[in-house]
């Protein structure tokens, strides 16, 4: 079904048709008019200066619908307004309905005008696609990625959510899960990504690259694993990411789809290009087919001829403009003459391009880079003397195929006689068929020949083998001579042969075919009658060939038989061909036509009308004339119902033209391209192409596809669209899209802007030196719009370039802004000026980013507290919100650093200042946050410490940032929290001091290990999340309560290691926790940090000193209260006090030592104190042991000789032993002492945790014991020891020696001189006793003791 707008009735409405043509700007060929508006003409094509009558207003950008034609002035065409007015009678009082009808009519008129404009534009585009001779499809353009739609983004979100919920089969460790969770929350759920998808600038590759960048830092920070490199982990994670992103989709299908899309993004065929621009311009399929056939787009000769006519028209228009002095308005008057030269040189360049095209039949769409010729004879068409052809220039090469089928009429020969044929082309080699019997003379043999003769002679002879013995040659039976032409029939035919004299068969016939191919440079051939003034001076019939020597040179040549060179030739340059009436006086020929040139006319005649039409069409293409000949009998033939088929079918192009005319398309086909304002037409097609491109499936960022670039390039070159106009329109279209939210590549804007800037400032980027006033004004307007856009993009850089995508776009934007700020293209803009502009943008950006962040935080808070709508905003709630806001602030700054702070890295020194400006931006951003932070901190009650996590969060970020560390905000943060830290340390110091005082007052000195079941009764810190340490509950009411704080490992230390007292353990943990907390603050200012450290070390030193002294006092008091007899057992508390010393020494190394050399004094001082105290404690304990030993020896002293007790005891025992068995005297004392020693040794060894202290104690104890015994014996040098004294001492000494040896006391200590003295004395006493006492010592002996020792060894 046809469109109603192209009905047959349209041909009757002449007024409407003419007005439609007027709107499109096509005027009669003889009345080329100047542009109606100089400004519109200036925006026109290079050299065309606008269109014909009405083109400026009707087709130009400023046209006002159909009425624009009236401003064209001049001749031809009716105004559309008159048509509208005459369509229906007007009412004296128009109603609302009539107004609506009028509006509807105007709308329909505008739609019809737009349709016609698009159809005309499509014709021009089709011709560019059909026969390109300037441009090619670029193969070096960056391949564009498929863009993500909103639905695809939601699908990807769902896939990642399913993975995080464990609903997929993809195995992953915790680290990868955390990375995906972070990516999902930060990137996929971001509103900035949704905006990027909406803008058409987000591709799957963007998502992948962001994830890769996101995980690289995470993977680098993972601990090293043997045999597993970080690269392996990275590639494994990316493979898993791809699996999640792809979901259940078959990768093969995805790959196939990607391959197909990649192919469509590369080189397109002609058919694909036609289809693309049908979609772009809204052309229907049947309209395309009508136009395609009528324009003969499949005929390269017709297309080349069309180009030659267009270029000739442009040269004529350039002459007209120069003659009438109707130039566009230039910035300089001197440019007018230059303008004409540019028009002509641009046409000459196109002519050279066309001339360099190979003369061929075409067919295959070749996209090779065209070789540009600079042949002077071709470019300077006016110099005929340089362009004359000689006969030798016209060289034709024909290929012939001769196929011999069979012979008839061989009756006189015997059936078995051998016959064969030969064939030759005059002047060439001779070929022969196979042999055949006379009864069946058939061959089907083909011979191939080549010749330069336009009318070759083909000879075919029939031979039979001679049977005579002396015959030298075979006998010729007959021959036939043919004179084929390229127009001759190609099928086989019967030919009568000329029979030899001696051949009895006179009716010989041969069936053969001669096919003569038409060479590529022969455009037509045939027999014509001709007569001319300079050539072919006699009216006679000749064989003519129309030869194309080059794209611009054609010759009409007449040939004689068997001649390679033409007999005569006529070069067709400057001639015009047309149909004519029969000429009187010329006999021969039926259908006449002529070729006319100033001073010469050549008349031709063919034998039939069909041949004449074909000749005129071929010569019309060759002459390049603007006038198209119309056959005088065309209408009658078309209307004839019973005309012969050959006449109707002959010129098939005429048949298609008639169909196009029937559907109203002829005006678009026959219109002269030179009469159109191609500037506005190109503006329209470029805008529509951009719309089509931005709506396709690629994330193009404004870049055209290779096929689109090719067609637009060809259109501009062929129709003379000025380069500056092209780029200005492109910039304007791109700016409109960018301002409306589309993502446009700044590099693309930069290319077009640089071109326009270079052109406007006279740098001739495309060789055009003329600059119109309109170009300059439009450039300034676009420059200002571009500056505003770029500044806005930099202000909203987080949203215009989310997560640093598109890659390099921010850097390109900065580069372009720097270019836009330049006053000209030579003088670089001062760096300070650029920095000032960008600084202003980034200051505004800080406000924009913080405002949006605050809003986001409020929305998040409202969602979280939806159930507590009426909840009051308490100081704690405000602080909690501030901490959450601080986390978001840090996240923003980290993203800025990661994604937006790289231009100076990639560009070397070009943007070295960008880092500084981003630091300023960050400080401004933080200063806005500081206002809210200060407000939240001001309302906090005094002496509360919940704000410390806020400091730690911010400080941990700031101190690791090279640029922000100790910056303005960081200093403010320190000033805010320094008094708080000092106050906190003061209170903690007071609290710890009081806990020491009160703790030691009520200290039970039980080890903590034995009190674990009673932990609530011990003064230990609360076990909560690590924040800030608690003050103990027993502090005065005047000191505020501390919030919870604990070190992660303190409970483990209490349970597993030391047996110190509750007070000491509490002290050491609090000191450690306080120092850990202050250390974890990582105070950035070195001086204050050292001050804090020094103060805490000094505090620890003082506190530990106090602990040590209090323990020493308690130790002495405890010893004084214990027993002095051998019933004494070392109490647990004594061991605990020793362990306190052990802990104090260990903790002092950590808590009291400073890294700086001179400040080791705290540590060394407390170490000395501990050492001295331990010595004193050992001395006191040893003194206690010595006291007990002295008590034992005092008991033994009662047995001394000469004492009353000794005599009495001796007599009593002797008397009693006669009647009863008296126990061995003294053994109970010895055993009690030995038990005491062993028990004390075991307790000390088991409970005291420092081996060195035990060794020192045992050494001192052993030496002191021996000294006391030695002294006691020395005092009795003159007395003989009582038997009981001797037995007791031997047992005590022997067991003491043995026990201390078992405890690890060295032999050098054990076998001291004192011990030797004691041993010798006791040995002597033993010998004496054994002599005086008949019964001896009852098995107790020093010797026995030695033997026992040896056995022990």
Swiss-Prot record:
Compositional bias segments (type: Gly residues): 44-77
Tissue: Specifically expressed in neural and endocrine secretory tissues. Expressed in brain and pancreas and at low level in heart. Also expressed in fetal heart, cerebellum, cerebral cortex, medulla, occipital pole, frontal and temporal lobes, and putamen, as well as weak expression in spinal cord.
Every PH domain range: 521-624
Compositional bias per record (Acidic residues), positions renumbered to this chain: 1-19
Keyword terms of this UniProt record: Calcium, Cytoplasmic vesicle, Exocytosis, Lipid-binding, Membrane, Metal-binding, Phosphoprotein, Protein transport, Synapse, Transport
Domain of life, source organism: Eukaryota
Span list, region Mediates targeting and association with DCVs: 1177-1353
Gene3D superfamilies: Pleckstrin-homology domain (PH domain)/Phosphotyrosine-binding domain (PTB) (2.30.29.30)
Membrane topology type: Peripheral membrane protein
Quaternary organization: Homodimer. Interacts with RASL10B. Interacts with the dopamine receptor DRD2.
Description of its domains: The PH domain is essential for regulated exocytosis and binds phospholipids and plasma membrane. It however does not mediate binding to DCVs.
Protein name: Calcium-dependent secretion activator 1
UniProt organism field: Homo sapiens
Upper classification of the organism: Eukaryota, Metazoa, Chordata, Craniata, Vertebrata
Originating gene: CADPS
């Amino acid at each position: 079904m046809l469109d109603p707008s192209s009905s047959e009735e349209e041909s009757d409405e002449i007024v409407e048709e003419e007005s439609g043509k007027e709107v499109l700007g096509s005027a009669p060929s003889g009345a080329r008019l100047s542009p109606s508006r100089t400004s519109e003409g200036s925006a026109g094509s290079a050299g065309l200066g606008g269109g014909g009558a009405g083109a400026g207003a009707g087709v130009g950008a400023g046209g006002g619908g159909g009425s624009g034609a009236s401003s064209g002035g001049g001749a031809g065409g009716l105004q559309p307004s008159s048509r509208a007015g005459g369509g229906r009678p007007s009412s004296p009082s128009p109603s609302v309905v009539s107004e609506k009808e009028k509006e509807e009519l105007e709308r329909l008129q505008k739609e019809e005008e737009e349709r016609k404009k698009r159809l005309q534009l499509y014709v021009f585009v089709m011709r560019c696609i059909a026969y390109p001779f300037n441009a090619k499809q670029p193969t070096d353009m960056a391949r564009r990625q498929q863009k993500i739609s909103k639905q695809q983004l939601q699908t990807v979100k769902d896939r990642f959510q399913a993975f995080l919920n464990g609903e997929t089969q993809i195995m992953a460790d915790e680290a990868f899960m955390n990375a995906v969770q972070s990516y999902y929350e930060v990137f996929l759920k971001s509103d900035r990504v949704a905006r990027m998808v909406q803008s058409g600038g987000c591709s799957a590759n963007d998502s992948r690259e962001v994830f890769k960048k996101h995980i690289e830092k995470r993977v680098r920070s993972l601990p090293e694993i043997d045999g597993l490199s970080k690269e392996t982990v990275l590639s494994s994670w990316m493979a898993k990411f791809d699996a999640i992103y792809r979901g259940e989709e078959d990768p093969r299908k995805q790959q196939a789809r990607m391959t197909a899309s990649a192919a469509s993004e590369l080189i397109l065929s002609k058919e694909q290009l036609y289809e693309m621009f049908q979609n772009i311009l809204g052309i229907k399929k049947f309209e395309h087919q009508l136009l395609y056939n009528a324009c003969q787009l499949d005929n390269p000769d017709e297309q080349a001829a069309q180009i030659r006519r267009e270029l000739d028209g442009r040269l004529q228009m350039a002459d007209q403009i120069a003659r009438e002095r109707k130039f566009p308005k230039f910035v300089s008057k001197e440019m007018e003459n230059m303008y004409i030269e540019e028009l002509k040189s641009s046409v000459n360049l196109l002519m050279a391009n066309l001339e360099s095209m190979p003369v061929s039949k075409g067919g295959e769409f070749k996209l090779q880079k065209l070789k540009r010729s600079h042949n002077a004879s071709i470019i300077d068409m006016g110099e005929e003397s340089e362009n004359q052809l000689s006969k030798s220039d016209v060289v034709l090469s024909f290929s012939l195929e001769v196929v011999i089928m069979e012979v008839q009429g061989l009756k006189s020969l015997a059936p078995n006689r051998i016959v064969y044929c030969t064939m030759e082309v005059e002047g060439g080699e001779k070929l022969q068929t196979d042999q055949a019997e006379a009864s069946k003379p058939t061959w089907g043999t083909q011979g191939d020949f080549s010749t330069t003769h336009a009318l070759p002679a083909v000879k075919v002879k029939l031979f039979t083998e001679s049977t005579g013995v002396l015959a030298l040659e075979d006998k010729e039976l007959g021959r036939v001579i043919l004179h084929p032409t390229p127009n001759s029939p190609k099928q086989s035919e019967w030919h009568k042969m000329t029979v030899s004299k001696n051949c009895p068969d006179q009716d010989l016939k041969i069936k053969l075919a001669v096919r003569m191919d038409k060479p590529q440079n022969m455009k037509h051939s045939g027999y014509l009658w001709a007569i001319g003034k300079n050539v072919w001076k006699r009216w006679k019939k000749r064989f003519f060939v129309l030869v194309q020597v080059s794209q611009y040179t054609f010759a009409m040549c007449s040939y004689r038989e068997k001649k390679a060179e033409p007999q005569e030739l006529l070069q067709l340059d400057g001639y015009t061909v047309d149909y004519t009436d029969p000429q009187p006086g010329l006999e021969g020929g039926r259908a006449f036509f002529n070729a006319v040139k100033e001073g010469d006319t050549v008349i031709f005649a063919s034998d039939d009308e069909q041949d004449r039409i074909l000749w005129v069409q071929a010569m019309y293409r060759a002459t390049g004339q603007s006038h198209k000949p119309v056959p005088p009998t065309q209408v009658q033939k078309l209307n004839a119902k019973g005309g012969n088929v050959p006449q109707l079918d002959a010129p098939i192009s005429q048949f298609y033209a008639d169909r196009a005319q029937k559907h109203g398309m002829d005006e678009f086909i026959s219109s002269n391209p030179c009469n159109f304002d191609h500037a506005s037409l190109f503006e329209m097609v470029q805008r529509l192409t951009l719309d089509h491109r931005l709506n396709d499936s690629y994330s193009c960022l404004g870049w055209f596809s290779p096929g689109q670039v090719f067609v637009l390039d060809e259109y501009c070159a062929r129709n003379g669209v000025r380069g500056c106009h092209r780029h200005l329109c492109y910039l304007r279209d791109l700016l409109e899209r960018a301002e409306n939210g589309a993502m446009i590549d700044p590099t693309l804007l930069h290319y077009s802007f640089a071109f326009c800037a270079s052109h406007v400032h006279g740098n001739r980027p495309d060789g055009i030196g003329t600059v119109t006033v309109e170009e300059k004004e439009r450039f300034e307007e676009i420059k200002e719009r571009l500056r505003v856009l770029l500044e806005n993009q930099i202000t909203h850089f987080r949203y215009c370039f989310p997560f640093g995508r598109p890659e390099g776009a921010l850097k390109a934007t900065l580069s372009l802004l720097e270019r836009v700020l330049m006053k000209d293209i030579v003088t670089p803009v001062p760096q300070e000026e650029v920095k000032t502009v960008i600084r202003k943008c980034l200051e505004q950006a800080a406000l924009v980013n913080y405002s949006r962040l605050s809003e986001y935080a409020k929305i998040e808070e409202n969602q979280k507290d939806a159930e507590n709508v009426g909840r009051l905003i308490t100081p704690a709630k405000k602080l909690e919100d501030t901490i959450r806001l601080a986390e978001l602030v840090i996240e923003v700054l980290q993203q800025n650093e990661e994604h937006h702070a790289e231009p100076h890295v990639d560009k070397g020194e070009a943007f070295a200042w960008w880092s500084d400006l981003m630091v300023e931006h960050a400080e401004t951003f933080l200063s806005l946050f500081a206002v809210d932070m200060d407000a939240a901190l001001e309302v906090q009650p005094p002496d509360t410490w919940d704000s410390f996590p806020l400091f730690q969060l911010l400080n941990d970020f700031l101190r690791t940032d090279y640029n922000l560390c100790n910056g303005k905000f960081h200093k403010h943060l320190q000033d805010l929290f320094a008094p708080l830290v000092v106050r906190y340390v003061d209170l903690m110091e007071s609290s710890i001091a009081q806990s020491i005082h009160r703790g030691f007052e009520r200290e039970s000195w039980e080890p903590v290990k034995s009190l674990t079941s009673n932990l609530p009764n011990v003064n230990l810190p609360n076990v909560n999340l690590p924040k800030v340490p608690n003050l103990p509950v027993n502090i005065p009411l005047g000191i505020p309560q501390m919030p919870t704080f604990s070190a992660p490992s303190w409970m483990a230390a209490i349970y597993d290691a030391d047996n110190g007292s509750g007070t000491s353990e509490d002290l050491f943990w609090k000191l450690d926790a306080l120092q850990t907390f202050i250390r974890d603050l990582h105070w950035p200012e070195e001086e204050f940090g050292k001050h804090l450290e020094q103060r805490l070390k000094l505090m620890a030193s003082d506190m530990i000193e106090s602990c040590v002294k209090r323990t020493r006092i308690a130790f002495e008091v405890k010893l004084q209260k214990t027993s002095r007899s051998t019933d004494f057992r070392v109490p647990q508390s004594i061991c605990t006090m020793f362990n306190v010393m052990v802990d104090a020494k260990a903790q002092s190394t950590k808590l009291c030592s400073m890294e700086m050399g001179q400040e080791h004094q705290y540590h060394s001082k407390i170490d000395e104190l501990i050492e001295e105290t331990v010595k004193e404690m050992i001395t006191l304990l040893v003194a206690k042991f010595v006291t007990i030993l002295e008590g034992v020896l005092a008991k033994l002293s009662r047995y001394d000789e000469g004492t009353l007790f000794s005599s009495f005891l001796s007599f009593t025992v002797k008397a009693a032993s006669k009647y009863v068995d008296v126990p061995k005297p003294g053994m109970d004392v010895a055993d009690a002492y030995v038990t005491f020693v062993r028990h004390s040794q075991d307790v000390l060894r088991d409970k005291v945790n420092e081996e060195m202290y035990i060794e020192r104690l045992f050494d001192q104890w052993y030496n002191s014991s021996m000294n006391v015994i030695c002294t006691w014996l020395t005092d009795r040098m003159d007395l003989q020891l009582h038997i009981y004294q001797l037995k007791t001492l031997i047992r005590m000494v022997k067991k003491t020696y043995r026990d201390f040896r078992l405890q690890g006391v060295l032999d050098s200590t054990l076998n001291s001189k004192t011990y030797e003295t004691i041993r010798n004395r006791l040995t002597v006493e033993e010998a004496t006793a054994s002599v005086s006492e008949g019964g001896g010592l009852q098995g107790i002996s020093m010797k026995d003791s030695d033997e026992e020792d040896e056995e022990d060894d």
